[in-house]
Amino acid sequence: MKTVKQVLENKGYQTHSVAPGATVYEALQKMAREGIGALAVLEGEELVGIVSERDYARKVILTGRDSRETLVRDIMTENVICVSSELRVDATMSIMTEKCVRHLVIRDDEKINGLISIGDVVKAIIDDQQFTIEQLEHYISGHG
């Protein structure tokens, strides 16, 4: 089973972030531009939260707020769940399922190495299972 590090090597180590004082609208523009669903919220180098499309839907749209006037700090999730890049992908999926989150911050030795989404995790698991199936088919057909 792949590790988070292997997923990041394929995906890239870029950490997309936003400042807590940015507007939600600015954060949404960045997410749309990058094709992602969440941003790390950094105050300087310090991780202070995570903001996602889900935060926007629940804390801005459903409450009638204006994304151009609401600040990221007002809707971000402060208790960020971080995992090591050495964690296996299946363990990562278990954490996401247990905690009901779709994004995790990857942090090693206090350094943020990226974000991983449930989509990244599912793709890695499917790729791993496909490889296993191909190996079994090869073995069964007598070529192994």
PLM region spans:
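Tandem CBS (Bateman) regulatory domains
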Residues: 1-13, 52-81, 88-97, 117-144
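A positional/architectural concept
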Residues: 3-48
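The conserved cystathionine-beta-synthase
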Residues: 17-35, 82-100, 107
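A glycine-centered beta-loop-beta connector
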Residues: 31-34, 39-55, 96, 104-119
